[in-house]
């Protein structure tokens, strides 16, 4: 078969992404490229037993919105999404003498 007989690679309509939390625990999802990530985020929340409202998801350091799709974010097969629990506060006073 010559190189001209080869069919061009057509990207799959699905990708596999890894969602990793701050404890380096990973959950893998196979998702459609054109479907909102809301479904995956809720599935992750259920899987780890954490309220969805307390989670933040990031790709390349940018927060992911519920209505964004993998195509909109430029997600590719085997990309990693970070999941963080919401942190309240974060401010402390230090008194120096």
UniProtKB/Swiss-Prot annotation:
Q: Reproduce the miscellaneous comment text.
A: Stress conditions rapidly and substantially elevates the amount of SUMO1 and SUMO2 conjugates with a concomitant reduction in the amount of free SUMO proteins. The SUMO conjugation system plays an important function in stress protection and/or repair.
Report quaternary structure and partners.
Interacts with SAE2, SCE1, SIZ1 and MMS21 Covalently attached to a number of proteins.
What gene, per UniProt, encodes this protein?
Answer: SUMO8
Major location category of this protein: nucleus
Transmembrane residues, as ranges?
none
Keywords from UniProt, A to Z, are: Cytoplasm, Isopeptide bond, Nucleus, Ubl conjugation pathway
User: SUPFAM superfamilies, from UniProt?
Assistant: Ubiquitin-like
Q: What does this protein do?
A: Ubiquitin-like protein which can be covalently attached to target lysines as a monomer. Does not seem to be involved in protein degradation and may function as an antagonist of ubiquitin in the degradation process.
What species does this protein belong to? Arabidopsis thaliana
Q: Which family does it belong to?
A: Belongs to the ubiquitin family. SUMO subfamily.
Protein name, per record: Putative small ubiquitin-related modifier 8
Which InterPro entries does the record associate with it?
Rad60/SUMO-like_dom, Ubiquitin-like_dom, Ubiquitin-like_domsf
Q: Where do we see the Glycyl lysine isopeptide (Gly-Lys) (interchain with K-? in acceptor proteins) cross-link in this protein?
A: 90
